[in-house]
Regions:
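Glycine-rich phosphate/ribose-binding loops and adjacent secondary-structure elements
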Residues: 364-366, 459, 466-474, 486-493, ...
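Nucleotide/phosphate-binding sheet-loop regions of phosphoryl- and nucleotidyl-transfer enzymes
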Residues: 1-423, 450, 456-459, 466-471, ...
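Short His-Asn-centered micro-motif
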Residues: 251, 461-463, 481-483, 572-573, ...
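Conserved alpha/beta-domain cores
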Residues: 98-99, 551, 561-906
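A short, small-residue-rich loop immediately preceding and capping a beta-strand
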Residues: 477-483, 501, 862
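Short beta->alpha connector loops at strand-helix junctions that form conserved
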Residues: 45, 482-484, 503-506, 594, ...
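C-terminal accessory/binding modules appended to enzymatic or scaffolding proteins
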Residues: 13-21, 433-475, 841-858
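Long, charged amphipathic helices and adjacent flexible linkers at domain junctions
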Residues: 69, 237, 399-451, 457-458, ...
Length: 906
């Protein structure tokens, strides 16, 4: 064979090591490494991840043929080290068969224990051990596991009857016992017989007695489990590629169920929930590993302090705890001391928090696994900073140890985990904006405001949202929509506000008129309580308690470390002074995008805006815009003041005018009354604004060109606000950005208006403020002609939301109708509106930066689409030499960490 497919380990030697995760998976690599550093590990061998991929290419029979010689030699290796023989009734060897991908996937794939048992081997083990209860307990567990995993008899869902559990419950009921461990030897033997009979009835085949046949069945079953439903789902959630495959580790069995000097357990070198430097875990005396995980019996704590904390929470007295639930530290002090020493050794070796599995067989401790432990966002930050302080890792390693996306958990309200265990999931959507939201259902933005003002917490439920819903979204605890993807209006705005949002819930049937929403046949009406989880996309019936996220000193220290190494600045997308203040507190170095359209939806502003839209002469429009000017100036003044001394990039009006007018008759009647005109006039004007494809229609700079008075008013408002602030002793740094430029002459025309108004404003105030004029690169043609546009633009800001839409030809708001199929069929690997397409859209960005800087070497370039907060996109921005990335306030820390990691990785 050209490639090595099987690697052995045992007795302090190993053919692999910790650096071979890609070949041996995390489990196999760490089993080898533990051998090499002197940790007691049962001998065994690992079949590589490449074989898993071969299995799916050539099939089971060919794989068995390819592996046969190596596997048989590896079994012989275990036999030699254990001084026993696989399948020999006189001196039997049993093995476990376990999965192990290169990334930890806890509980996602399958394991088989006690493999090698048959009737003859069982009797031989009884003679050898003198412990028939242990032997037949192991035997019935093996037959059940083999039936579940290899013969695929485990029910597909929880409502179906498990044939093995049904038999166990029948036997326990006849005997009158509650726990499996209380069954007699004869009853355990009866279970084995009945299990085998159930297998024959369901498969038409006898349970395999040949241990070699059992072994091949188990190995191939573990490979099959790589593609089981839960493993596929987990990989999607964690971004683990399907092509990685799983390794298979076969190890000599050691038994935690051989009596009161035997035990099994799971432990962590630090607290995985909060990061506290406290050794902790659970163990069970006289049990096998799955008993701890399955929760059939109440496990006991490993440390005394852990046991005392557990008892206090459970309301158990110290006397009762010591008598009934002693810690391992108290009940098995010598084993505990060895366990504690080894867990310290493993953390020192791996320089990270370890998640370990162990078994004690008749007083001897064996380690079955170690891996870097899964942890919460809070624990992740604390552990990284603590390890830095302890001198175990350096600053760069501390930065790289933290996952940017997990910082989300620290920034938004979260559901109480205990309460979630009892919550009823009623729908699943897209996790559009993280956090937890709970409140009474309302269907209209006005109602959301009114209910909020009356002291109610509300969840705004919409088919989809629009800019008109902004105030209602702001008042709501969370937003739930039937349509829209991860970058729909609801999602983008919610993230900007730090609001929880679940979008694209196809099972929602919203009836605005009746003020009801039907979900899978159940009708929920206005005022009913629901809870939404923007981190998972789940929707729950009723109120699920939440708790506020608290930021630690460790978090601040991590962010300071990031600033020490980063080269790419992080700005924020902010439309209000509050957003700006939040982002600045999170470390934003300015504003990369202020959307002026969101400022127009207050009551008085929208009336003036609609008067401008209704006007059919430039004079009429200027009169209406004069009413808007003081409002706009006040808005800009607040934002520039909040970001004092830092740049604020303000985008001139971008959306089409139809978004500012009502489309329902009641709203149009109200508008007619406010405007002092008849309903027919309003209807005609609204109809005239309708466009077949508004995304590519009369919007952006096209509005400023057809209605130059809009550009003039907004420029006047921005620069007047800046002049007033400068006179008050502040240091405003405005940037005026012209949107949707595709042709150089568009920018020239708008720039002329801006410069003319600037001269007028500075003359009025008798003071000048430095400002820059730039453009948004969001049309492919603008990117391709960047060298020409840079002759007029002082900076580029890449609007990657629209650039992605126009490059792919996908509508951002409609992609949810086909994206799931594209992802499932692997046409797309990821949603291009969430993760920047580096091969297409990214190439346009890179090209535009290079061409622009050929003409203007000092050209500042940034990104202000939602990609600005996505870690891999931020790293790409750093790689191609952008000056900054801009994202919503609550994604600023994520982008700061990603930017620092990009610098460290260089």
């Amino acid at each position: 064979m050209s490639q090595k497919r099987v690697f052995t380990f045992g007795n302090g030697k190993a053919e692999g090591n910790a650096q071979m995760r890609e070949q041996l998976g995390g489990k196999g690599a760490n089993l080898a490494e533990m051998n090499l550093i002197g940790v007691p590990v049962p001998p065994g061998f690992t079949i590589t991840t490449d074989v898993c991929n071969e299995y799916y290419e050539v099939g089971q029979e060919k794989i068995m043929e390819l592996l046969n010689d190596d596997v048989m030699a590896a079994v012989k290796h275990i036999e030699t080290l254990m001084n026993s023989k696989f399948g020999d009734a006189q001196n039997p060897l049993l093995v476990s068969v376990r999965s192990g991908a290169r990334a930890s996937m806890p509980g996602m794939m399958d394991t088989i224990l006690n493999l090698g048992l048959n009737d003859e081997v069982a009797e031989g083990m009884v003679r050898k051990t003198g412990n028939p209860h242990f032997v037949y307990d192991s035997y019935r567990r093996f037959v059940q596991m083999y039936g579940d995993v290899v013969l695929e008899l485990k029910p597909a869902n929880k409502t179906d009857i498990d044939p093995f559990e049904e038999i166990i419950e029948q036997v326990k009921a006849i005997r009158g016992v509650k726990l499996d461990k209380d069954l007699s030897v004869d009853e355990l033997k009866e279970l084995v017989v009945r299990f085998k009979k159930a297998i024959k009835e369901r498969t038409g085949k006898d349970f395999p007695n040949d241990p070699i046949e059992q072994l091949w069945g188990a190995i191939c079953a573990v490979f099959r489990s790589w593609m089981n439903e839960r493993a596929i789902l987990y990989r999607k959630m964690e971004g683990i590629p399907d092509e990685w495959g799983t390794a298979v580790s076969v190890m000599a069995m050691v038994f935690g169920n051989m009596g009161d000097t035997s035990a099994t357990g799971v432990c962590f070198s630090r607290d995985a929930a909060n990061g506290e430097n406290l050794f902790n875990g659970e163990y069970l005396v006289n049990a096998q590993g799955e008993d701890v995980v399955a929760g059939i019996r109440t496990p006991q704590q490993i440390t005394k302090i852990g046991s005392q904390r557990w008892a206090e929470r459970a309301g158990i007295s110290e006397e009762e705890r010591k008598a009934k639930y002693p810690s391992m530290e108290e009940a098995m002090p010598e084993i505990y001391a060895e366990l504690d020493a080894i867990q310290n050794k493993l953390e020192e070796h791996y320089r990270d928090m370890q998640d370990m599995e162990f078994t004690v067989q008749e007083g001897k401790l064996w380690f079955l696994q170690t891996r870097n432990g899964k942890r919460t966002g809070a624990a992740m930050v604390k552990i990284a900073i603590d390890l830095l302080h302890e001198g175990k890792i350096d600053e760069k390693t501390a930065i790289m140890r933290c996952e940017p996306q997990k910082l989300d958990e620290l920034l938004h309200p979260v559901f109480d985990k205990k309460a979630l265990a009892f919550a009823k999931v009623i729908a699943q959507g897209l996790p559009a904006s993280p956090g937890a939201g709970c409140g009474q259902i309302v269907f209209h933005a006005d109602d959301a405001q009114a209910w909020h003002n009356d002291g109610h917490k509300v969840v705004l439920v919409r088919i989809e949202t629009s800019p008109e819903d902004l105030a209602g979204m702001s008042a709501a605890e969370g937003i739930l929509t039937a349509r829209g993807g991860m970058t729909s209006h609801a999602a983008v705005v919610a993230r900007g506000m730090g609001k929880c949002c679940v979008s694209g819930v196809g099972s929602l049937n919203v009836d605005y008129k009746a003020k009801t929403v039907e979900i899978d046949g159940v009708v929920y009406k206005e005022g009913d309580y629901i809870s939404i989880n923007g981190t998972t996309g789940q929707v729950y019936a009723g109120e699920v308690p939440t708790k506020a996220a608290e930021l630690s000193g460790d978090f601040k220290e991590l962010m300071d470390l990031c600033d020490k190494y980063t080269k790419l600045q992080v700005r924020t997308n902010a439309d209000t002074p509050h957003d700006a203040e939040v982002a600045r507190a999170f470390g934003a170095k300015g504003i990369g995008l202020t959307r002026t359209e969101h400022m127009f939806f207050d009551d008085q502003k929208i009336i003036a805006m609609r008067q401008m839209i209704l006007a059919d002469t430039a004079e009429g429009r200027e009169k209406a815009l004069a009413k808007l000017l003081p409002y706009q100036k006040a808005d800009f003044k607040g934002i520039l003041k909040a970001m004092d001394g830092l740049p604020v990039n303000i985008r001139l009006l971008d959306p089409p005018l139809h978004e500012f007018v009502p489309h329902d008759e009641a709203g149009q009647q109200t508008m007619a009354k406010e405007m002092g005109v008849d309903l027919a006039t309003i209807k005609r004007r609204v109809a005239s604004l309708a466009e077949n494809n508004p995304m590519l229609g009369h919007r952006g700079c096209r509005l400023g060109i057809t209605f130059p008075e809009i550009t003039a008013m907004q420029t006047r408002a921005i620069l007047s606000a800046a002049c007033e602030l400068k006179k008050e002793g502040f240091d405003p740094k405005p940037e005026i950005m012209v949107p949707l430029i595709g042709i150089l002459n568009e920018l020239k025309q708008q720039k002329a208006i801006i410069q003319k108004v600037a001269a007028e404003v500075f003359a009025e105030y008798g003071i000048e403020v430095e400002f820059e004029i730039g453009t948004m690169i969001e049309i492919p043609r603008a990117a391709l002609t960047a060298d020409r546009i840079a002759t007029e633009a002082e900076y580029f800001s890449f609007g990657t939301n629209d650039l992605t839409q126009m490059t792919f030809g996908y509508s951002r708001d409609d992609i949810a109708s086909f994206l799931p199929a594209y992802l499932e069929k692997k046409i797309l690997k990821v949603d291009p509106f969430q993760v920047l397409d580096q091969n297409g859209v990214g190439k346009l960005v890179k090209y535009a930066v290079e061409k622009g800087r050929e003409v203007r070497p000092t050209l500042r370039c940034g990104i202000c689409g939602e990609h600005g907060g996505e870690p891999s996109s931020v790293k790409f921005c750093a790689k191609i030499g952008l000056n900054y990335a801009s994202c919503s306030p609550f994604r600023v820390p994520i982008a700061r960490l990603a930017a620092a990691q990009a610098a460290v990785e260089e």
